[in-house]
């Protein structure tokens, strides 16, 4: 949950800064000077929407390290046999998945793990000390396979594209609603007034919350795919099923809110529609019915 929250917060922060800057520069007033110029508004919405998502993606790896306090393991000088095993296991899984070797990191915390990075060949896999201490090596390897599968599937890129599209609609619709509220409720006939800017701000918050349901749905689907990817990389579904079962009996480690959707375990937030992860039981059931080639 931690990683996705940070991604979304960074994304929204960039959107807000861009929106505010463009308002100060009078772009909103220009677009609505002669009624709404939908073509110009759409271009503005795309610029604001995708800029936030892309910047969030590009800084996702350093932000993840900073927010979790993760320590990257030097492959040439690991701090003991456990760290050496971690690096070797991640590299082997990456080779099977056909991607470059990710950086491998450890952070202190309850059982969890995550993967992040803008590019498949320049990514990061991090695992908590709590997870390492509570699982067998085979179960840890399955969790690492799950994270490597996220990278191989290009989940962060897809999330960025989805977030960009969602942002575009949020920005576009908020300004359309703001324009008509300013005209019909506040009776402003010249340019745009305070009613427009207040309505846009409120609508961006409301529409952004509703849009997060779409992002959460995608996150749940990618968890099923990553579970299946782990089973394929491990050559068996059993290790991942055992790892999930163990997680189901443990308190999921909380990642910083911005990165929650990247973790192996999450609490789901405000109800099922906002949950970044499916229920553990549903994930195990999906693995039971999959075919491992």
From Swiss-Prot:
UniProt entry keywords in alphabetical sequence: Cell inner membrane, Cell membrane, Hydrolase, Membrane, Metal-binding, Metalloprotease, Protease, Transmembrane, Transmembrane helix, Zinc
GO biological process: proteolysis
UniProt entry tagged with the keyword Transferase: no
Free-text remark on how the cofactor is bound: Binds 1 zinc ion per subunit.
Top enzyme category: hydrolase
Active-site residues per Swiss-Prot or TrEMBL entry: 147
Principal cellular location given in the protein's record: membrane
GO molecular-function term, one example from the UniProt record: metalloendopeptidase activity
Pfam families, sorted: Peptidase_M48
Assigned EC number: 3.4.24.-
Signal peptide boundaries: none
Superkingdom of source: Bacteria
Membrane topology term: Multi-pass membrane protein
Cofactor: Zn(2+)
Binding site for Zn(2+): 146, 150, 223
PANTHER family referenced in this protein's UniProt entry, alphabetically: PROTEASE HTPX
Family, similarity comment: Belongs to the peptidase M48B family.
UniProt-recorded name of the protein: Protease HtpX homolog
Organism of derivation: Bordetella petrii (strain ATCC BAA-461 / DSM 12804 / CCUG 43448)
Classification of source organism: Bacteria, Pseudomonadati, Pseudomonadota, Betaproteobacteria, Burkholderiales
Annotated gene: htpX
């Amino acid at each position: 949950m931690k990683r996705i929250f940070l991604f979304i917060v960074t994304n929204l922060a960039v959107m807000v800064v861009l929106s505010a800057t463009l308002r100060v520069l009078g772009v909103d007033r220009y677009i609505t000077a002669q009624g709404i110029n939908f073509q110009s508004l759409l271009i503005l919405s795309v610029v604001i929407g995708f800029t936030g998502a892309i910047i969030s993606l590009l800084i996702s790896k350093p932000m993840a390290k900073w927010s979790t306090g993760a320590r990257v393991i030097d492959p040439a000088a690991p701090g003991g046999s456990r760290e050496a095993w971690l690096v070797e296991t991640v590299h082997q899984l990456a080779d099977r998945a056909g991607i470059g070797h990710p950086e491998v990191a450890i952070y202190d915390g309850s059982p969890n793990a995550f993967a992040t990075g803008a590019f498949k060949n320049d990514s990061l896999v991090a695992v908590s000390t709590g997870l390492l201490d509570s699982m067998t090596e085979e179960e840890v390897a399955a969790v690492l396979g799950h994270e490597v599968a996220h990278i191989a599937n290009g989940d962060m890129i897809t999330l960025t594209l989805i977030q960009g599209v969602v942002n575009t609609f949020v920005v576009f619709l908020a300004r359309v609603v703001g324009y008509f509220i300013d005209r019909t409720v506040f009776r402003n006939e010249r340019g745009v007034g305070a009613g427009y800017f207040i309505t846009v701000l409120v609508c961006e918050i409301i529409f952004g919350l509703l849009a997060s349901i779409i992002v959460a749905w995608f996150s749940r689907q990618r968890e099923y795919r990553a579970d299946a990817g782990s089973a394929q990389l491990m050559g068996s579904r059993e290790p991942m099923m055992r790892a999930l079962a163990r997680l189901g009996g443990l308190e999921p480690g909380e990642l910083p809110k911005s990165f929650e959707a990247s973790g192996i375990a999450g609490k789901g937030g405000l109800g099922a529609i906002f949950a970044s992860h499916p229920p553990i039981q549903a994930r195990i059931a999906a693995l039971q019915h999959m075919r491992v080639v």
